[in-house]
Structure formats: structure tokens, C-alpha cells
Amino acid sequence: ATKSAKPTYAFRTFXAVLLLAINFLVAAY
């Protein structure tokens, strides 16, 4: 039950990093 909150936080963090990486690649391109 303690791990119910971790997946969403990790997923949002991953997504946020992924979006930043995409924006950086698009800006660099």
C-alpha cells in the first residue's frame, strides 16, 4: 500500500524529463 503513490510520482517525473528532452532536441534541431 505504501508503493501506491510512488509509481505516479516516478511516472510524472519521467514524463517531465522526457518532455524537457524533446523540447531541447527540437530547439537544438
Curated annotation (Swiss-Prot):
Gene Ontology cellular component terms for the protein in this record: photosystem I
Q: Provide the disulphide bond pattern.
A: none
Sorted alphabetically, the keyword list is:
Photosynthesis, Photosystem I
InterPro entries according to UniProt: PSI_PsaX, PSI_PsaX_sf
A Pfam family of this chain: PsaX
Organism superkingdom: Bacteria
Q: Which GO terms describe its biological process?
A: photosynthesis
Q: Which family does it belong to?
A: Belongs to the PsaX family.
Q: What protein is this chain from? A: Photosystem I 4.8 kDa protein
Q: What is the lineage of its organism?
A: Bacteria, Bacillati, Cyanobacteriota, Cyanophyceae, Thermostichales
Give the gene name: psaX
